[in-house]
Amino acid sequence: MNDILETETPVMVSPRWDMLLDAGEDTSPSVQTQIDAEFRRVVSPYMSSSGWLCTLTIECGTIICACR
């Protein structure tokens, strides 16, 4: 159990963000609409099968979930 706490959490970055940044636009992953879209894309399949409803709070960077 202690090993889990000591390992570094992997960070997932959307390939779409990388493309926008490489294109030279002043767009970053912190843009709320991009974060919301990626969150829905990644989390939606799990929410529909599990009965949980989740949202991401950008201020704290936390995921809040509630059972339907």
UniProtKB/Swiss-Prot annotation:
It is found in: Secreted. Lanthionine-containing peptide antibiotic (lantibiotic) active against S.michiganensis subspecies sepedonicus strain 2136 (MIC=30 pmol/ml). The bactericidal activity of lantibiotics is based on depolarization of energized bacterial cytoplasmic membranes, initiated by the formation of aqueous transmembrane pores. There is a cross-link at residues 57-65, 62-67 (Beta-methyllanthionine (Thr-Cys)). Residues 1-47 form a propeptide. This is Lantibiotic michiganin-A. One of its GO terms (molecular function) is signaling receptor binding. The modification 2,3-didehydrobutyrine is found at residue 55. There is a cross-link at residues 49-54 (Lanthionine (Ser-Cys)). It comes from the Bacteria. Keywords: Antibiotic, Antimicrobial, Bacteriocin, Lantibiotic, Oxidation, Secreted, Thioether bond. Maturation of lantibiotics involves the enzymatic conversion of Thr, and Ser into dehydrated AA and the formation of thioether bonds with cysteine. The 62-67 beta-methyllanthionine thioether bond is oxidized to a sulfoxide. This is followed by membrane translocation and cleavage of the modified precursor. The keyword Methyltransferase does not apply. The gene is micA. The keyword Secreted applies. Belongs to the type B lantibiotic family. GO terms for biological process: defense response to Gram-positive bacterium; killing of cells of another organism; pore complex assembly. GO terms for cellular component: extracellular region.
